[in-house]
Structures are given as C-alpha cells and as structure tokens.
C-alpha cells in the first residue's frame, strides 16, 4: 500500500509541476507577444512620424510626445527625451534624402544649426521643470498659437514660393537669433523645432517653402543631436522604444521626402497646422 501511496503522491506532484510549468510558459508567451505587439506599434508610429516629419520639416515630435504621454503613459520628461532621439534619426534620414535632391541651402543650414546648439542644451535642463499641469499648459498653448499662425500664413502667395529660388542675400543674423530660440524650444518640448523654423524662413527670410523644409530638416539633425546628449545625461530617454520608433521614422522619412515634391506648399502648411491644432487642444484639455 505504501508503494501505491508514494506513487500517487509523485503523480500529484508531477501534475502540479506540469501545471506550474505550463502557467509559466503561458505567461512568458503572453509577455513576449505583448512585447512584439508593442514593438510593432512603435515601428508603425515611427513610419508615420518619419513620413510627416520629412514631409513638413517638423521632426515629428508633435506626434510622438502626445502619443507617448496619452497612449503609453510616459512621464513628460521621458516622452520628451525619447522624442528627441526619434527626431534625430528622422532628421538624419530626411537630410540624406533632401541633400540628394539638392534642396538644402548649405550656407543657412550651417549657420542656423550651430546657433541651435546652446539653446538645445539649455532646453533639456529646463524640461526638468515641466511637470503636471504646467507641462500640458505650455505644450497646448504653444501648439495652438503655432497652428493658428501657420494656417493664416498658408496663403496662395506662399504657394507661389514653391518653385522660387533661395535669396542671394538674406538676414542671416536674424536667422541665427531665431535659431537659438528654436534650439531651446526643440529640446524643452521634444518637437524638433521645424514648426517655428519653416514659417520663419518662408515668411521672414523669403525662402521657397520646399527649400525651407529641406534646410530645416538638416538643422534638426544638429539641434536634436545636442539635445540628445543632454537628455541622455539627465536620464530622460527610453532607449528601446526610442530606437524602435526611430527605425520606423528612418524608413518613413524617405517616403516623406519623395511625397514633398508632389504637393503644393499651401497644402503642406495647412496639413501641418491642422495636426498641430488638434494636438494643442488635447493638451489644453488635460491642463484643465
């Protein structure tokens, strides 16, 4: 009888171990599946960001930050820092495409890019103070004002600048001054800065829209690199998600570069303004 009892106990223990093993396997499978779905979502987001970023010369941060905050529930600083990483990869890809098309104004790109660096470093440290309602209020107000300005400026006259030429003489000192502020905003908000640079270059410095977009994308590559270094030092970056989104953005940016040649400048500006306005309203609603 003792033999049967021992055998029965062993069978029960074996069944329990088998159930535990299956449970662990199922948990691991679900965890892996969840990670795969998350990576797939990040890649898809990256492709969209790259497409819009290169198409409009705005880096894509205005899409990344809201989604990381509202969908993936990232802390503001982590969303901003991770966005800067994606903006860098997106801008590098877009710059490569625009340089091949010979649409980048090298002189302006070099001067303005260097000017963004000090502002980018300051912005990354200022981002430490964007907490709670202040974060949503600052983002919302900035996005709404920028959207109104962009839509108002997207007139038929602006569309005529698409086929224009780069002015031989432009106020580069004013451009440098603006670029310092752009670097600050890009780093503190994680948005790239093209949302300010493109309208400024078009309506103040009289650059053709497509040249302004291409040059702004090149400038973003430098300013976001400076911002990335300082955000990394502060521990603001989630590298796994940032690299996944960035990989998709690198691919999507090439599509944006190709599509930008076929659209009128007025359409580009209006598309950007609507997207920015929706995002700004969402942020302001969260600040209430």
Each language-model region and where it sits:
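N-terminal amphipathic/basic-hydrophobic helices that include classical n-h-c signal peptides
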Residues: 1-36
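Selected transmembrane alpha-helices and immediately adjacent juxtamembrane segments
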Residues: 25, 31-75, 159-213, 243
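Hydrophobic alpha-helical transmembrane segments of integral membrane proteins
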Residues: 39, 43-54, 76, 84-87, ...
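Transmembrane alpha-helical segments of multi-pass membrane transport proteins and ion-pumping complexes
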Residues: 46, 50-58, 62, 90-95, ...
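Selective hydrophobic functional segments
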Residues: 81-137, 141, 224-269, 274, ...
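C-terminal membrane-cytosol helix-exit motif in multi-pass small-molecule transporters
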Residues: 143-155
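Hydrophobic alpha-helical transmembrane segments of multi-pass integral membrane proteins
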Residues: 151, 214-227
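Juxtamembrane boundary at the C-terminal end of a transmembrane helix
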Residues: 281-288
């Amino acid at each position: 009888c003792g033999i049967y009892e021992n055998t029965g106990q062993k069978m029960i223990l074996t069944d329990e171990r088998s159930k535990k093993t299956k449970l662990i396997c199922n948990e691991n499978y679900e965890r892996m599946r969840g990670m795969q779905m998350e990576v797939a979502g990040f890649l898809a987001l990256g492709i969209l960001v790259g497409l819009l970023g290169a198409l409009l010369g705005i880096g894509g941060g205005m899409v990344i930050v809201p989604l990381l905050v509202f969908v993936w529930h990232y802390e503001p600083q982590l969303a901003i820092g991770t966005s800067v990483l994606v903006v860098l990869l997106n801008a590098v890809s877009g710059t490569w495409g625009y340089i091949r098309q010979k649409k980048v104004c090298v002189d302006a790109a070099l001067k303005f890019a260097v000017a963004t660096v000090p502002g980018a470093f300051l912005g990354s440290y200022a981002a430490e103070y964007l907490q709670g309602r202040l974060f949503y209020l600052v983002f919302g107000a900035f996005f709404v004002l920028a959207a109104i300005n962009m839509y108002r400026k997207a007139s038929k006259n602006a569309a005529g600048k698409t086929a224009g030429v780069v002015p031989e003489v432009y106020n580069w000192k004013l451009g440098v001054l603006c670029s310092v502020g752009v670097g600050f905003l890009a780093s503190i908000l994680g948005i790239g800065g093209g949302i300010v640079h493109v309208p400024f270059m078009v309506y103040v410095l009289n650059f053709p829209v497509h040249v302004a977009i291409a040059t702004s994308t090149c400038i973003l590559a430098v300013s976001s690199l400076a911002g990335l270094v300082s955000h990394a030092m502060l521990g603001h970056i989630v590298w796994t998600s940032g690299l996944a989104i960035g990989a998709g953005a690198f691919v999507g940016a090439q599509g944006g570069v190709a599509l930008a040649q076929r659209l009128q400048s007025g359409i580009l500006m209006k598309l950007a303004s609507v997207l920015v306005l929706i995002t700004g309203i969402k942020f302001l609603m969260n600040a209430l």
